[in-house]
Amino acid sequence: MSGPRSTLGLSRRALLRAALAGGAALGATACTPSAPATPLVIAGGVRPGVYISLAGTLADIWRERLGLDGAPQVLTTAGSTENMQLLTGGAATVAISQVDVAADVATGITGPGEPMALARLYDDVTHVVVRRDSDFRTLDDLRGARVSIGPAGSGYQPIALRLLDAAGIGADGLGERAELGLPEADAALRADRIDAFFWSGGVPTGGIRDLADELPIRLLDLGDVLDRVRQRFPVYSVGTVPANTYGLPGPVACLSVRNVLLVTAAMDDGTARALIDAAFLDQPRLAQASPAAVTIDSRSAIGTQPVPLHPGALQFYRSAKDY
């Protein structure tokens, strides 16, 4: 899959150099850049993970395509919530986040610090993983169980709490609550220290696939609570994990959430446009970084609502005439 052809009048290298310098007028985008002359800092995610893989690949693409003097810095983080804190606090200039977390953080923020999207990237699905030989079949069965809801700062802990609330359990209804990342939750399930864990990621998620290769698992079907969750939080959608993804007994209904690439309103239009232009030119490299990124294209990339597109990104999509 190839990205749309660039329509910028200036070379991308010249464009971003001018944008980051904050001085030259860019006739191709009819704007005057005003971004400070600071290096790009990308808030990524946990290692290993899709976020950190895509962030690292984007850093390489932008350095090579746009002739940056230094490679963008990629930050290892707990995930969406921490990424949004870094972005809105000025410690990062670019971030990847679930759109629900981004929308929650953006509420009430106006002016230069307002989060704005460059693109929708791919969709995550929420996994609730249990051993196949267990008696757990629905979320309600987790009442009194030992469950990991994900680490603080991740994007999927809020999803886990919302799902548990919709099931009438809530976090207090669990027997023991842990806040483990995927590798730690994987190890804890293998060692029978927990009964279940929540995870939100692309399908397939490598860590879950590796676990399923060694330990028969099931994913809890979320179909009985999805309508209640979506009535309160329409940002979510319904998805399905096919049976053959992890050798499951059958397909599983799940909750799906979009992931978006974000900057703030402080970034000038020329820089924002150059970043997304370069990313689409090298979209196959993003797909190589993670199978989840195979679906990235400019037709679906505009679907970042309720987070607004940055004006520079909107210029790019309009010029691409591909939606």
Question: Across the structure, where does each feature detected by a protein language model lie?
Answer:
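N-terminal secretory signal peptides
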Residues: 1-10, 18-28
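Bilobed "Venus flytrap"/periplasmic-binding protein-like clamshell domains
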Residues: 39-65, 70, 74, 124-191, ...
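Pocket-flanking alpha-helical
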Residues: 60, 73-112, 128, 183-189, ...
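A structural signal for short loop-to-beta-strand junctions that line the ligand-binding cleft
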Residues: 111-121, 147, 245-253
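Short Pro/Gly-enriched coil loops immediately N-terminal to beta-strands
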Residues: 118-125, 212-213, 223, 253-256
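A bilobed periplasmic-binding-protein/Venus flytrap-type ligand-binding module shared by bacterial periplasmic
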Residues: 125-136, 232-236, 248-270
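An extracytoplasmic/periplasmic, membrane-proximal ligand-sensing/linker region
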Residues: 180-184, 190-191, 201-214, 219, ...
